[in-house]
């Protein structure tokens, strides 16, 4: 018996590849959430969600960077991406574990993930304003994970879709991968946005 089998006796050699497949699958299914914020920046502009209002602390509720156009555009972009990612499997291998589900399910599930990511980002902006941090200021941890928490939380509105993909069995390994890879991916995407002139800060 290989040494690692003594450490992980419940994982058979045949099951190990299946468990490892959960990592790229979780990242695959989470792509709509990953793309929501960058697309919100691309489609952003126009009236801010908070309509320019401030709270009693004198700080804006969210700030000018959070707009209705960005919220709608980012959500739709993520929904369309999920639909496009799923179409090849729907046509060639409907029962594939990589499929988002039938077209309607793929669109709705991806929209929920994307909207959750953007709502999580809104909560992050709200917290930063309460901390008197200006728009674009760094808030380690909050900046990297607000959208992840928001997307995963809202995805529980459709548990039949989200639980087997993120919250049970081997999918938990994929969830861990999302948590680990997010800071580096977040940094890379923001750097690209900065180079393209879409963001004022490279973080």
Region locations from a protein language model:
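Interhelical loop and helix-boundary elements at the membrane-water interface
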Residues: 2-154, 165-203
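Transmembrane helix-loop junctions at the membrane interface of multipass transporters and ion channels
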Residues: 158-164
């Amino acid at each position: 018996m290989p040494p690692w089998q003594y450490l992980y006796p419940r994982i058979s050699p045949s099951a190990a590849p299946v468990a490892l497949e959960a990592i790229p699958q979780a990242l695959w299914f989470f792509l709509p959430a990953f793309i929501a914020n960058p697309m919100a920046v691309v489609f952003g502009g126009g009236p801010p969600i908070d309509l320019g209002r401030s709270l009693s602390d004198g700080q804006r509720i969210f700030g000018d960077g959070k707009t209705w156009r960005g919220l709608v555009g980012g959500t739709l972009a993520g929904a369309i991406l999920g639909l496009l990612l799923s179409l090849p499997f729907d046509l060639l291998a409907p029962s594939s574990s990589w499929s988002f589900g039938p077209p309607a399910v793929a669109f709705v599930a991806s929209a929920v993930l994307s909207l959750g990511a953007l709502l999580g980002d809104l909560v992050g902006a709200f917290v930063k304003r309460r901390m008197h941090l200006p728009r674009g200021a760094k808030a380690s941890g909050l900046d990297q994970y607000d959208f992840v928490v928001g997307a995963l939380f809202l995805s529980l509105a459709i548990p039949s879709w989200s639980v087997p993909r993120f919250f049970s069995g081997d999918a938990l390994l994929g969830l861990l991968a999302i948590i680990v890879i997010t800071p580096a991916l977040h940094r890379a995407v923001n750097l690209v946005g900065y180079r393209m002139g879409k963001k004022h800060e490279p973080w």
